[in-house]
């Protein structure tokens, strides 16, 4: 179904550009009414757009596995946009920058969760115009909003924004605490990183920390299975010490650098200072989100809103 919508979107865009129609539309009636001749004529170009989009996700956005893809629906306009622009244009730094901002605004603003056909039509026109330096409404970018309090309610990978924030950590080259692995396409396939608590759940329950806080994305990060086993249910001060003893030649300065590559305050983690660590990491994640969206987060004072 998504392939049919993508093909219809691309064809509708071309028809508007050539003056055959006045609007871009890829609703059910448009998909059903797509002429076979148009489908055949555009098939190879649309397929190439999908391949370009896949490369954009792998190379530029650090989305390596299907399970980590925030929205499958956003692939529809992305592939159609890439088909219109072509591979050479899509590989230009300015195009990557423009598409990246649109991509992250769509994910972090959680814009693709419902009926999206109208948004797809806006997206293909807006992004092609923006890449080519022409005025446009930038509907998705301008509509996207991320509130700091959303961090507390991001509890599972069912949310697109949850997956998106984890991909942003991959983009920043976060390193595994024990073996120093950075998560790239090769390592993600070979070693299967997953998302785990930084202050372990068992420890937080014992200390009376609210589940709303310890189970939020603020207290989670991607690590490898061996590291997660070393963490167990122990206090951070205990598992950091255990990792230092277990890994030959690992200095505390190096462990600190690895931990801080996840935007975690090492001193607060080592001191088992959940509250201080929690606020600092929330602020760091909000900085990361603002950087990706290139626009401010609402309710930015995390220390007040995330207590």
Predicted regions and their residues:
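Polybasic, low-complexity binding patches
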Residues: 213-214, 231-260
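Intrinsically disordered, low-complexity N-proximal targeting/linker segments that flank membranes
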Residues: 107-196, 203
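Structured, charged N-terminal subsegments at the starts of enzyme catalytic cores
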Residues: 7-85
């Amino acid at each position: 179904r998504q392939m049919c919508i993508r093909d219809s979107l691309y064809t509708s865009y071309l028809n508007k550009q050539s003056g055959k129609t006045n609007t871009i539309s890829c609703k059910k009636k448009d998909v059903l009414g797509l002429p076979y001749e148009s489908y055949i004529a555009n098939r190879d170009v649309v397929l190439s757009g999908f391949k370009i989009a896949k490369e954009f996700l792998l190379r530029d956005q650090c989305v390596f596995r299907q399970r980590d893809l925030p929205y499958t629906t956003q692939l529809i306009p992305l592939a159609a946009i890439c088909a219109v622009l072509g591979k050479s244009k899509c590989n230009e730094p300015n195009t990557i920058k423009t598409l990246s901002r649109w991509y992250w605004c769509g994910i972090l603003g959680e814009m693709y969760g419902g009926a999206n056909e109208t948004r797809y039509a806006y997206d293909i026109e807006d992004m092609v115009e923006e890449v080519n330096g022409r005025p446009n409404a930038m509907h998705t970018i301008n509509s996207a909003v991320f509130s700091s309090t959303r961090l507390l309610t991001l509890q599972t990978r069912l949310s697109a924004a949850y997956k998106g924030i984890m991909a942003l950590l991959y983009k920043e080259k976060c390193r595994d605490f024990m073996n120093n692995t950075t998560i790239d396409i090769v390592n993600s396939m070979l070693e299967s990183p997953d998302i785990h608590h930084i202050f372990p759940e068992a420890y937080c329950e014992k200390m009376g920390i609210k589940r709303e806080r310890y189970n939020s994305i603020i207290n989670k990060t991607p690590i490898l299975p061996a590291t997660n086993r070393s963490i167990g249910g122990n206090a951070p001060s205990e598992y950091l010490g255990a990792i230092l003893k277990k890994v030959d030649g690992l200095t505390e300065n190096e462990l600190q650098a690895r931990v801080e590559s996840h935007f975690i305050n090492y001193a607060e983690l080592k001191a088992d200072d959940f509250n201080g660590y929690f606020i600092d990491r929330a602020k760091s994640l909000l900085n990361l989100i603002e950087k990706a969206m290139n626009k401010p987060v609402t309710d930015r004072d995390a220390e007040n809103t995330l207590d």
